Amino acid sequence: MKKAYRVKSDKDFQAIFTEGRSVANRKFVVYSLEKDQSHYRVGLSVGKRLGNAVVRNAIKRKLRHVLMELGPYLGTQDFVVIARKGVEELDYSTMKKNLVHVLKLAKLYQEGSIREKEI
């Protein structure tokens, strides 16, 4: 995933948390904030309670890969995905299904309307 598609600064994270809205399911929480930009930006958060650094990094790698696949279906908002307990046990396809579900609830996933892929 290109750096232009990532939320990195603490200021951006705090703006999304304070000004944005949140949606959750059993495995993920998504905070989103509408922005006037040409593509989405995403921040990932995986807490220490999910496991050691190896486990947390594996979760983040899977999430980044799922988000790269879903990129053409995502809007132009900034959003943060927070992994909840139990996500470390999910395989790739189940993780993708759960993430698509919560992104649909947040109205970030636009099924059927594919933007031109920029990733």
Curated annotation (Swiss-Prot):
Superkingdom of origin: Bacteria
| Catalysed reaction equations from the record | Endonucleolytic cleavage of RNA, removing 5'-extranucleotides from tRNA precursor
This enzyme's EC code(s)? 3.1.26.5
Q: Name one Pfam family in it.
A: Ribonuclease_P
What's an example of a GO molecular-function annotation for this chain?
Answer: 3'-tRNA processing endoribonuclease activity
Q: Which InterPro entries match?
A: Ribosomal_Su5_D2-typ_SF, Ribsml_uS5_D2-typ_fold_subgr, RNase_P, RNase_P_CS
Q: Which keywords describe this protein according to UniProt?
A: Endonuclease, Hydrolase, Nuclease, RNA-binding, tRNA processing
Q: Which GO terms describe its cellular component?
A: ribonuclease P complex
**Where would one find coiled-coil regions in this protein?**
none
Please give the biological process terms from Gene Ontology that the record holds.
tRNA 5'-leader removal
Q: How does it assemble?
A: Consists of a catalytic RNA component (M1 or rnpB) and a protein subunit.
**Family to which this protein belongs:** Belongs to the RnpA family.
Q: Which HAMAP family match?
A: RNase_P
Q: Extract the NCBIfam families matched here.
A: rnpA
Q: What does this protein do?
A: RNaseP catalyzes the removal of the 5'-leader sequence from pre-tRNA to produce the mature 5'-terminus. It can also cleave other RNA substrates such as 4.5S RNA. The protein component plays an auxiliary but essential role in vivo by binding to the 5'-leader sequence and broadening the substrate specificity of the ribozyme.
Protein name from the UniProt record: Ribonuclease P protein component
Which organism was this protein described from? Streptococcus mutans serotype c (strain ATCC 700610 / UA159)
